[in-house]
Amino acid sequence: MEFKIMSTTDKIEQKVIEMVAEKLNKDKSIITTDSRFIEDLKADSLDTVELMMAIEVEYGIDIPDDEATKIKTVSDVIQYIKERQS
């Protein structure tokens, strides 16, 4: 039996992709770290606000509006979370 040990980054990535899929009603198989919320996943501004709020609750962090506007991709979210958790 083989066990895969997930790094913190892997766990964050997996959870963020699940959250994005749920909030944007997308199949998580189409979401990558390079996926852009508006251009690739067809999110609107309300979708992105709701997603940022869910991320804040899940990870116990604050994402000010001026920072949220800079978050364009799944990778941006993961990086933001990692920076706030370290």
Curated annotation (Swiss-Prot):
GO terms under biological process: lipid A biosynthetic process
Keywords from the UniProt entry: Cytoplasm, Fatty acid biosynthesis, Fatty acid metabolism, Lipid biosynthesis, Lipid metabolism, Phosphopantetheine, Phosphoprotein
Molecular-function GO term, any one: acyl binding
Keyword Protein biosynthesis: no
Signal peptide from the UniProt entry: none
InterPro entries: ACP, ACP-like_sf, PP-bd_ACP
Main subcellular localisation: cytoplasm
Modified residues (O-(pantetheine 4'-phosphoryl)serine): S45
Post-translational modification comment from the UniProt entry: 4'-phosphopantetheine is transferred from CoA to a specific serine of apo-ACP by AcpS. This modification is essential for activity because fatty acids are bound in thioester linkage to the sulfhydryl of the prosthetic group.
Coiled-coil regions listed in the entry: none
Pathway annotation from the record: Lipid metabolism; fatty acid biosynthesis
GO cellular component term, pick one: cytosol
Locations listed in the record: Cytoplasm
Start and end residues of each Carrier domain: 10-85
Domain of life: Bacteria
Similarity remark: Belongs to the acyl carrier protein (ACP) family.
Known function: Carrier of the growing fatty acid chain in fatty acid biosynthesis.
HAMAP family found in the cross-reference section: Acyl_carrier (MF_01217)
Designated name of the protein: Acyl carrier protein
Record organism: Rickettsia canadensis (strain McKiel)
Gene transcribed to yield this protein: acpP
